[in-house]
């Protein structure tokens, strides 16, 4: 009987833990977008694990936190990089040990040269739990989906 109770309770605890982790990484997304809109390359870089890999669209992978920091310093210094709004719609979220994996669709709007530009895409992100209990980006890959004309 005790074994049955244990087996019945463990999945519930795992779901609660997954929900708690989802809340934590959702807050990290919020911090990330805020840092990008402030053009704060250091704050963006701090959201990445030391051994992270960034896989930007149509570019070579950026490997390691130092290289990712340099990537973001160049990105936010570009005058074409402007503030944006972004809405993420998670379509899968799984936790395995100290890794949380999420796929999502995103929709956003930015204004450049007085023209409003809408964009849509998808991403795959793996978050890694740090020794201090926080979650940082371990792998990140995204792509925009061209609008249908």
Give a label for each model feature.
Residues 13-46, 53-149:
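A beta-strand edge to alpha-helix "cap/lid" segment located at domain peripheries
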Residues 1-9:
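Bacterial N-terminal signal peptides
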């Amino acid at each position: 009987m005790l074994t049955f109770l244990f087996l019945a309770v463990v999945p519930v605890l795992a779901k609660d833990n997954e929900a708690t982790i989802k809340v934590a990484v959702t807050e990290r997304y919020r911090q990330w977008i805020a840092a990008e809109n402030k053009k704060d390359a250091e704050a963006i870089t701090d959201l990445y694990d030391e051994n992270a890999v960034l896989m930007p669209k149509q570019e070579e992978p950026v490997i390691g936190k130092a290289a990712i920091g340099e990537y973001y310093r160049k990105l936010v210094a570009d005058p074409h990089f402007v503030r944006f709004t972004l809405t993420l719609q998670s379509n899968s979220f799984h936790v395995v040990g100290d890794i949380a994996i999420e796929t999502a669709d995103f929709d956003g709007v930015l204004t450049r040269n007085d023209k409003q530009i809408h964009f849509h895409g998808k991403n795959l992100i793996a978050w890694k739990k740090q020794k201090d209990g926080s979650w940082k980006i371990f792998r990140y890959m995204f792509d925009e989906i061209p609008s249908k004309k």
